[in-house]
UniProtKB/Swiss-Prot annotation:
Residues 43-314 form the Protein kinase domain. GO terms for molecular function: ATP binding; protein serine kinase activity; protein serine/threonine kinase activity. The active site is at residue 163. This is Casein kinase I isoform gamma-1. GO terms for cellular component: cytoplasm; nucleus; plasma membrane. SUPFAM superfamilies: Protein kinase-like (PK-like) (SSF56112). One of its GO terms (biological process) is endocytosis. The gene is CSNK1G1.
Length: 456
């Protein structure tokens, strides 16, 4: 009964222009009689791989190229829409720079706005779990050198990021030539620090509401000061120490209210000397943090100096920048199983450094990983074809950190790794639930309707 309609839809799709990239002005998505949900003329919507208060993250497929993509869906009537702003920032950043995902399309999808992005690999938080929640110095330095460059590029486009956390930095898909590159994603909380009209730096202000992730945000952000370039770099420094130490001194603090908890995190951060935070690690880690914390609000950071701190330490240790991260040789979690990263295929060896084994972290890692990943568990390594899927959860997970957002800056994302078929309804937002420390304070409950719905 549906064959004529399906054939008509296929003919319509094949008569369109460029196969890969659809512009903002392309026709709205359609749902064929078969129940297939489309975003624009090219992209078929698949199962849900993440959700949060922004809407949902779905797996998608480009019907022209047969490539998998990630599709972010946000209700058009969202209380604090951010998807179009994020799309605008991606366009402002451009697609030529290394370590930024390709953006293929933005447009309506029924009652939702949709943004189609390149599907990347797992986040640094996923990989941190995989490596028993500690990274070696070599891996952290290779990450740090790349992320200083990513942040320099973002800042060069007159944007500050304001959302540093391991979940927002992803490696490329395994088997892809960019699988070793650390990507930066999710610009929903970004802000222009250069006024587009006056071309001047935004003014210094105080009494600002918190924006970002409390675990990593700068001390000045806790104090209510307007963020600038210095704050992105300080947050990176906190994340680097998180990777080296396995945790930060201000994690796990108890308080009666969220406001009190944020206050305690900020107080502990201020009262922890850099020397104590970086104790038992190379002095260069402390040098980095001291420098970024002393920057003036308007000051342009010396990115070359910061990179040099870490590159010289890297060379002093005798490391080779071969991208032999700690996760190389381990099975990488994907939506359909796992992919074993074979270091032999890329001539990368792990002999240049020894992974620090911390058995005491194992039970904690297993529990935390199972709580957060759900069905995204690592299965025994097996052969897969070149079209295997990798996780794209970094924009939608919190990794145990308390997350805060200004009401004027959009909404935050959290992962619900429950798979869904392409004809499953995209559920609306429900109530906010405050959960324990291991979760996010902005977690949104989802109730799936029993009866299937179609977008008209």
């Amino acid at each position: 009964m549906d064959h004529p309609n399906r054939e008509k839809d296929e003919r319509q799709r094949t008569t369109k222009g460029m196969p890969g990239r659809s512009g903002h002005g392309s026709r709205p998505s359609s749902s064929a009689s078969s129940g297939v949900l489309m975003v624009g003329p090219n992209f078929r919507v698949g199962k849900k791989i993440g959700c949060g208060n922004f809407g949902e993250l779905r797996l998608g497929k480009n019907l022209y190229t047969n490539e998998y993509v990630a599709i972010k869906l946000e209700p058009i009537k969202s209380r604090a829409p951010q998807l179009h702003l994020e799309y605008r920032f991606y366009k402002q950043l451009g697609s030529a720079a290394e370590g930024l995902p390709q953006v293929y399309y933005f447009g309506p999808c029924g009652k939702y706005n949709a943004m189609v992005l390149e599907l990347l690999g797992p986040s640094l938080e996923d990989l941190f779990d995989l490596c028993d929640r500690t990274f070696t110095l070599k891996t952290v330095l290779m990450i740090a050198i790349q992320l200083i460059s990513r942040m320099e590029y973002v800042h060069s486009k007159n944007l500050i990021y304001r959302d540093v956390k391991p979940e927002n930095f992803l490696i490329g898909r395994q088997g892809n030539k960019k699988d070793h590159v650390i990507h930066i994603i999710d610009f929903g909380l970004a802000k222009e620090y250069i006024d587009p009209e006056t071309k001047k730096h935004i003014p210094y202000r105080e009494h600002k509401s918190l924006t970002g992730t409390a675990r990593y945000m700068s001390i000045n952000t806790h104090l209510g000061k307007e963020q600038s370039r210095r704050d992105d770099l300080e947050a990176l420094g906190h994340m680097f120490m998180y990777f080296l130490r396995g945790s930060l001194p201000w994690q796990g603090l108890k308080a009666d209210t969220l406001k009190e908890r944020y206050q305690k995190i900020g107080d502990t951060k201020r009262n922890t000397p850099v020397e104590v935070l970086c104790e038992n690690f190379p002095e260069e880690m402390a040098t980095y943090l001291r420098y970024v914390r002393r920057l003036d609000f308007f000051e342009r950071p010396d990115y070359d100096y910061l990179r040099t701190i870490f590159t010289e330490l890297f060379e002093k240790k005798g490391y080779t920048f071969d991208y032999a991260y700690d996760w190389v040789g381990r099975p990488i979690p994907t939506p359909v199983g796992s992919v074993h990263v074979d270091s032999g295929t890329s001539a990368i060896t792990r002999d240049s450094h020894v992974h620090r084994d911390r058995p005491s972290q194992q039970a904690l890692r297993n529990q935390a990983s199972s709580d957060r990943r759900g069905e995204w568990e690592i299965q025994p390594s097996r052969q897969t074809n070149t079209s295997y899927l990798t996780s794209h959860l970094a924009a939608d997970r919190h990794g145990g950190s308390v997350q805060v957002v200004s009401s004027t800056n959009g909404e935050l994302n959290v992962d619900d790794p429950t798979g869904a078929h392409s004809n499953a309804p995209i559920t609306a937002q429900a109530e906010v639930e405050v959960v324990e420390e291991a979760k996010c304070c902005c977690f949104f409950k989802r109730k799936r309707k029993k009866t299937a719905q179609r977008h008209k």
